[in-house]
Design a protein with these regions (language model features):
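Short aromatic-glycine-enriched beta-strand elements
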Residues: 200-204
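Primary recognition of N-terminal secretory signal peptides and signal-anchoring hydrophobic helices
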Residues: 2-199
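A short macromolecule-binding patch
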Residues: 207-214
Length: 214
């Protein structure tokens, strides 16, 4: 009888250990952070000389800037719709016209800015404006990041102070909140991020102008 009870207890204990191990494995799989990295070109919807456009920290779907001869340009149509409708393109004379209170400014493909680069380009049926030209006549901030694998340009109309936060330990910035979401980039401890939105367990942040969740 004692041997039988010992056998039964051993079986029960073994089953409990197996069940516990299985439950632990399931929980580990469930909460193990994903190490999958996104395809940068697919995520930003830009490659080569294309430049991903962000407006007030939101990626603009279907709109891309262009990197031309070391400078970043924005499509005139988008600039007109989003930030400044006063840039007028004279199709007949292939020139840009901008009307100020006391003068009218003209520019064509031969007009260059302080950088020595053309203020506008005509390519693929689109008129492209140099970012410095846009900021010269528009109350916006423009930052360009053109040395990474995917080029990005950030156009902001808000001048409000930004909420900053320090990253306390090595972390991953993800596409969405949740450990199973794909990783955009790794962030070392003591890095600084801009907090766009504070959620219950995650924050929507910008790091070196890469939009993500942390």
């Amino acid at each position: 009888m004692k041997r039988f009870l010992a056998t039964v207890l051993t079986v029960i204990l073994t089953i409990m250990l197996v069940v516990g191990a299985a439950a632990g494995f399931i929980l580990y799989r469930k909460y193990k952070p994903s190490k999958e990295h996104v395809d940068q070109k697919e995520w930003y919807q830009a490659s080569g000389d294309e430049t991903a456009v962000f407006f007030n920290s939101e990626r603009v779907e279907g709109v891309q800037g262009r990197y031309i001869d070391g400078q970043t340009y924005l499509p005139l149509d988008w600039v007109n719709k989003a930030v400044n409708e006063k840039f007028y393109w004279d199709e007949e004379n292939s020139q840009l016209i901008y009307t100020l209170p006391d003068q009218i400014v003209y520019a064509n493909a031969e007009t260059v800015g302080n950088s020595g680069k053309p203020l506008l380009e005509q390519q693929d049926g689109t008129v492209w404006l140099l970012t410095s030209l846009v900021t010269a006549y528009t109350n916006v901030r423009i930052e360009t990041f053109d040395t990474d694998s995917v080029r990005r340009v950030f156009v902001d109309t808000s001048w409000d102070p930004q909420q900053l936060a320090d990253v306390k330990k090595n972390s991953a910035l993800r596409v969405r909140g949740g450990v199973k979401s794909a990783v955009i980039t790794e962030v070392p401890a003591d890095s600084e991020v801009i907090v766009l939105e504070q959620l219950e367990n995650w924050s929507r942040v910008l790091k070196a102008k890469k939009l993500s969740y942390h």
